């Protein structure tokens, strides 16, 4: 619809709420006694977040950077003509990584690779609505 009508997109949480981090960054955090600064979820990455972070790191290396967040932003920006992602960051280094994304053009192979790392999650409220209606219809053991 956005493409058809020439609408802009402003995706939110494109960097996974700070949960997309390279293995090196996570090891450094642990060494310093830090965890992921997140309002929602555990202080460690989930298996899916680890897989996504590793894939972002692999693509980042192909583009000559260590910034998984720059790749995440570049990925979202590649999906439509007018994309203005809402980005976060609490340090100057975060801002520099966000800006770096503007100079990264992902290849079709990069995009395909990133899209196949984990199954697509349609997210809330869709998962809640569908799961709730299925459990009501079939019971929790059958969903």
UniProtKB/Swiss-Prot annotation:
- Does the record's keyword annotation contain Oxidoreductase? yes
Q: What's the EC number here?
A: 1.1.1.-
Question: One Pfam family name from the record?
Answer: Aldo_ket_red
A molecular function GO annotation: aryl-alcohol dehydrogenase (NADP+) activity
Domain of life from the UniProt record: Eukaryota
- Signal sequence residues: none
Provide the alphabetized UniProt keywords. Answer: Oxidoreductase
**Entry keyword Cytoplasm:** no
Q: Which GO terms describe its biological process?
A: aldehyde metabolic process
Q: What functional role does this protein have?
A: Putative aryl-alcohol dehydrogenase.
Family, as annotated: Belongs to the aldo/keto reductase family. Aldo/keto reductase 2 subfamily.
User: What is this protein called in UniProt?
Assistant: Putative aryl-alcohol dehydrogenase AAD15
Query: What gene does this protein come from?
Result: AAD15
